[in-house]
């Protein structure tokens, strides 16, 4: 009987790991049936899947012969599901050790008695389980009716396990080894619900207890968990999230929420004893003592909110001055960690591509380089030698010349030296602006008027009366209303020929030249033919040239055409 009781204790430990509780009397009846069917299990069995499956085959054989009590197979299924669950592995190892100790202490006489008893039972077995009938028609050892059980039922003791207890199945605690059909069906339903909860956790709804009251905390009195338990999930259909139930439990542990019996979320303050012990440690040993540090580390095991930490520190420190100092340091550490979290893993490109602009201040360039390096390396102080080398190589020539004699002084000294370098207000910037202004002024004075031909103003600003066009066609070309003396002016000293925009076909393409024209007038970025043109004279001579196209009243033939014709410019 002692070995069977040890197996019952081991089974209770395994079932409690899955929040299942079966009455000890029911497990004892189950082990009696196991000892009758397979007495070898108490001697050499183990809490392994292979050994339990072997026991299941023995039970199936007896069930096929009609020699198995009701409810035995259902309890076997519950234990098998627990053995296959990885969450029950620690409890299984502990129970297996207890079972092995009992088996080792079992004498050879007891072993032989168990095996001999099995042989005697096998020889005297019948087709059905032995039952004796009393005069009243009631079978001996049978369970009482539900009506009688309600009268004899004792007040259940308060359990410290929040799962649904199997006493809701109304199993009797009598000495009978058999179960009636209703109890067998209830136990089978419990097995089905357990398997549904295990293999389909998202479809499972939390079962309500008899009194519809939130179960008590899991931990027994006197012990404290490492972190507060998360609030209970209230799932509807399981289709509102793609995450499995276990993953959602891990997410909730990041910031636990407490719920009361009605389901409302409440705030649970820090335990008074914890605060009292920490305050006494600070008062007796100081804030830097090892014992005080240990107390703080003990508090760190709990999932405390920022408000909880502030309240706790304010309560344990002796004065508000130390609290304000701690709060300032705490804020600095939180902001530093927030910056690290925000910039970690977000690089802004290659550091070699960050170059100081011509008009960019040296301080802005250093700030861009330091920010990019902190995003890549995390801590910019550790990468400071690399940052200094990149800043020196990719700064402007003026800044490099100022840094070179003080290259070993560090980045702060470089910022001080280059503070006045770069930007539009430097000597180089002012000189460039002055030269640019004088250049534009000189160019404006060298422009010629197309109306009067004088320098210093444009045609739109000319005060002279506008010249009228000739009313007759030119007798030389027969095309334009101009004088013959102005028709196709020959070499005027120009190197390139210029075609009047009036005679240039609109379908011929032009491009903007990168050179400027300067003679009697000035033209910046003039238009030039997009392709070379071919000219041919009356004598059969021909050549190629690329003329400029300007809004002139006449065409100007330059040396690029006249020299090919064999003409030269003389002063005769």
From Swiss-Prot:
Where exactly is the site Cleavage? 92-93, 255-256, 299-300, 431-432
Sorted alphabetically, which keywords does the UniProt record give?
Aspartyl protease, Hydrolase, Metal-binding, Protease, Repeat, Transposable element, Zinc, Zinc-finger
* Spans through the membrane: none
The Basic and acidic residues compositionally biased stretches are 132-142, 190-199
Q: What class of enzyme is it?
A: hydrolase
Q: Where is the composition biased (Basic residues)?
A: 117-128
Give the enzyme's EC designation. 3.4.23.-
- Give a GO biological-process term: proteolysis
Record flagged with keyword Zinc-finger:
yes
State the protein's name.
Intracisternal A-particle Gag-related polyprotein
Its gene name is gag
